[in-house]
Amino acid sequence: MRPLTSGLSLLVILSGGVAGRVAGQEGGAVSALEYEGWRQYSVHCARCHGQDALPNPVAANLLVSMAPGGPAADKAAFIKVVRDGRPERGMPASGGVMTPEQIEAVYAYLKGRAEKRIPAGRPKEPAEQPKQESKG
């Protein structure tokens, strides 16, 4: 009975490791700002707009809205909509919940998704930048 248990344990460990690597590789490399945007989007926006900002019947298609020429492609227009909301369409104002920096980070993430630079899925967390020593 012991070899079977060990074999099953090994199989579970190996399959979990492979699944973890695949899931981690699903999204592409992003900037620190885009990664923070993904984090903020996941907390504040995904409930209605979907985890990957894919089209759905509940909320606006952000990939179309944020694409070049779209109604929210302009950064100022995007910030205004997020800050003030669109009550007539059921979108709440987030200006009192999100900081301007958080809104700008979400803009960077969604812009990358709309421009197809950032694939669906959890983006790969950017590596920490080495600190530069000051000369003096």
Model-derived features with residue positions:
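Flexible coil segments in periplasmic/lumen-exposed cytochrome c-class electron-transfer proteins
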Residues: 24-31, 39-43, 92-136
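His/Cys-centered metal/cofactor-coordination and adjacent catalytic loops
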Residues: 20-33, 46-68
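Short, intrinsically disordered, low-complexity terminal segments
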Residues: 15-16, 20, 43
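Positively charged n-region of N-terminal signal peptides that target proteins for export
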Residues: 1-4
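Sequence/structural segment immediately N-terminal to covalent heme-attachment motifs in c-type
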Residues: 30-52, 77-84, 136
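Bacterial N-terminal signal peptides
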Residues: 7-17
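Extracytoplasmic electron-transfer domains, predominantly the class I c-type cytochrome c fold
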Residues: 56-57, 63-115
